[in-house]
A protein has these predicted regions:
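Short, charged recognition helix plus adjacent turn
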Residues: 3, 58, 66-76
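Short basic helix-loop element that most often maps to the first helix and adjoining turn
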Residues: 11-30, 55
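Short coil turns linking two alpha-helices in DNA-binding domains
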Residues: 23, 34-37, 63
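DNA major-groove recognition helix of helix-turn-helix/homeodomain DNA-binding modules
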Residues: 32, 51-67
Length: 76
């Protein structure tokens, strides 16, 4: 079961990737992961743990604290 917060988290990650002008393949290369890693978390087939989220945020050039603050403002 996917919650609204999980869905919005994924949407914001996709938005951040697109804002960084990166494809899934380009992001996965920065992460040293297969493209399917990015695809699966963006589609909700897998969740990111906190360490993975930090790695994704760094690869996207975003501040993870600000990202989560935005998420929680939007879902409150």
């Amino acid at each position: 079961m996917t919650t609204d917060a999980q869905k919005r988290f994924r949407e914001l990650l996709v938005e951040a990737r697109k804002d960084a002008d990166l494809t899934q393949a380009e992001l996965s290369s920065r992460l040293n992961r297969p493209q399917s890693f990015v695809s699966k978390y963006e589609r909700g087939e897998r969740r990111l743990d906190v360490v993975e989220f930090g790695e994704v945020a760094r690869a996207l050039g975003i501040d993870p604290v600000n990202f989560l603050a935005r998420l929680y403002r939007e879902i409150a």
